[in-house]
């Protein structure tokens, strides 16, 4: 079951301060942020069946609880960003640790080899 925090996409960029993948308490940072910033936490639960797809805004606080089953939990993730997206110059923590290996050393532009253009809107 996927968990989304309702309205959290409006809270702005909030990079995780600690461990991003498989932390001991996956809601710790959410609870700390909400308390510090007087935000209400309202969780919406979304059951994504095998073969199903879920989409969400990149700022949305999301996650899932522990997998207590004997089965592995598998997922494929695709991050879709606008064609003019750039690496954030001040985002050094959280997921930046994961994605910094895709950054060009001489630019904040996304590298086409890792972030290919999927569609173009011809207005």
List PLM regions with ranges.
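Double-stranded beta-helix
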Residues: 1-61
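Non-heme Fe(II)/2-oxoglutarate
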Residues: 17, 53-55, 59-123
């Amino acid at each position: 079951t996927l968990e989304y925090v309702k309205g959290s996409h409006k809270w702005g960029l909030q990079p995780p301060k600690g461990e991003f993948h498989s932390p001991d308490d996956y809601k710790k940072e959410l609870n700390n942020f909400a308390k510090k910033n007087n935000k209400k936490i309202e969780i919406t639960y979304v059951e994504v069946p095998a073969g199903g797809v879920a989409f969400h805004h990149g700022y949305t606080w999301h996650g899932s609880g522990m997998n207590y089953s004997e089965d592995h939990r598998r997922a494929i993730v695709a991050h879709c960003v606008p064609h003019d997206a750039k690496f954030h110059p001040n985002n050094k923590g959280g997921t930046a640790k994961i994605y910094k290996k895709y950054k060009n050393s001489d630019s904040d532009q996304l590298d086409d080899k890792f972030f290919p253009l999927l569609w173009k809107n011809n207005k």
